[in-house]
Amino acid sequence: MTHQTHAYHMVNPSPWPLTGALSALLLTSGLMMWFHFNNPTLLVLGLLTNLISSYQWWRDIVREGTYQGHHTKVVQKGLRYGMVLFIISEVFFFLGFFWAFYHSSLAPTPELGGCWPPTGISPLNPLEVPLLNTSILLASGVSITWSHHSLMEGNRKQMIQALMITIALGLYFTALQAMEYYESSFTISDGVYGSTFFVATGFHGLHVIIGTTFLITCLLRQLLYHFTSNHHFGFEAAAWYWHFVDVVWLFLYVSIYWWGS
């Protein structure tokens, strides 16, 4: 390694952006093949290659930051800006789903029976599983904050306990959401109501799964003593992402489950 006189991390050539992009292509193509031709082969292949690429890329970043010391204050500042911009892009991503929902529900067309929910649709009761899911995510927001503060105070035991509680709540939320989908009386193909409901809540559910994976990675890293009280951006990014998922759910609950029913 040559001597450098700046604090920036000059990243080595990596194959993971290329394999990640190709796996994303397989994933989206596979999703269309599954929806239209009931053939999940390409989707499974896309999922596997995406998971492998993500794991390898994440592993390299952990090595660079933890063992090679590349994540200086300047690099961490850049990573923070990157995470903030990523979350802003996600806000606009979900904004599109809310736009589609309100566009369809505020002025229902004659094809929908001129009412919302459309004729023939039995919406889910917002005071049952959706309300429980809201409580779970709010509780997980409290526990992730507890975990973060414990880490900053150097309380390793409480940090691990709080993080495990957050992960358990995330898994519980996912299980309840899957049960809700299974028992729902309508599907994604039941007109604009089914489409907007399942796409919006489904993408949120996917974000919960990604966030839970992020937190599990942080738990493993904490068990391996990767984090210190003043050097833990990986965990901080996971906490930001989790809070974003919490806030999106509140808007989904109020809009689609409560007002939309």
Curated annotation (Swiss-Prot):
Stated family: Belongs to the cytochrome c oxidase subunit 3 family.
Cysteines joined through disulfide linkages: none
Pfam families: COX3
InterPro entries for this protein: Cyt_c/ubiquinol_Oxase_su3, Cyt_c_oxase_su3_dom, Cyt_c_oxidase-like_su3, Cyt_c_oxidase_su3-like_sf, Cyt_c_oxidase_su3_a-hlx
Entry membrane topology: Multi-pass membrane protein
UniProt function note: Component of the cytochrome c oxidase, the last enzyme in the mitochondrial electron transport chain which drives oxidative phosphorylation. The respiratory chain contains 3 multisubunit complexes succinate dehydrogenase (complex II, CII), ubiquinol-cytochrome c oxidoreductase (cytochrome b-c1 complex, complex III, CIII) and cytochrome c oxidase (complex IV, CIV), that cooperate to transfer electrons derived from NADH and succinate to molecular oxygen, creating an electrochemical gradient over the inner membrane that drives transmembrane transport and the ATP synthase.
Subcellular localization(s) per the UniProt record: Mitochondrion inner membrane
Protein name as annotated: Cytochrome c oxidase subunit 3
UniProt subunit comment: Component of the cytochrome c oxidase (complex IV, CIV), a multisubunit enzyme composed of 14 subunits. The complex is composed of a catalytic core of 3 subunits MT-CO1, MT-CO2 and MT-CO3, encoded in the mitochondrial DNA, and 11 supernumerary subunits COX4I, COX5A, COX5B, COX6A, COX6B, COX6C, COX7A, COX7B, COX7C, COX8 and NDUFA4, which are encoded in the nuclear genome.
One biological process term in Gene Ontology: mitochondrial electron transport, cytochrome c to oxygen
Regions of this protein lying in the Mitochondrial matrix compartment: 1-15, 67-72, 153-155, 224-232
Gene: MT-CO3
